[in-house]
């Protein structure tokens, strides 16, 4: 198990990194805008100086070509950048292209069930982000979703990692 921080706040990232337990970071332009603004690329590069592991950076485009262009640009910033692509038909297409043709690691995000995670795995995702807090908020069992996804990864021989994301309270991490 690895612990990632979801933030663009440099002080939060610095404090978390100091604990010695953080292995990566996930972030997006909205988090950066609410954490002091400035150039998103510069913010990501500063985070990369604080974190030794991967940093997942989310695209804002909604169409496949826009996502692809942003993903390629983000991947040029540093070899540790993992591109966050939202779960959608366009997102799956882009994931397949990035992982298969461009050798760019992808974190498919905003997933609410194991079927979505399975599709992301089949598209070649390096990471699948299941929104645990939101799954629980909807009245479903996030633990079962995580177990089903882990089982599919094991049985299918995938090397992808699961990110249990969108933790909203203590109950989400028990």
Roles of regions detected by a PLM:
Residues 1-14, 19-22, 27-101, 132:
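Active-site beta->alpha loop and helix N-cap motifs at the rims of alpha/beta catalytic domains
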Residues 92, 105-107, 112-174:
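Catalytic alpha/beta core domains of metabolic enzymes, predominantly
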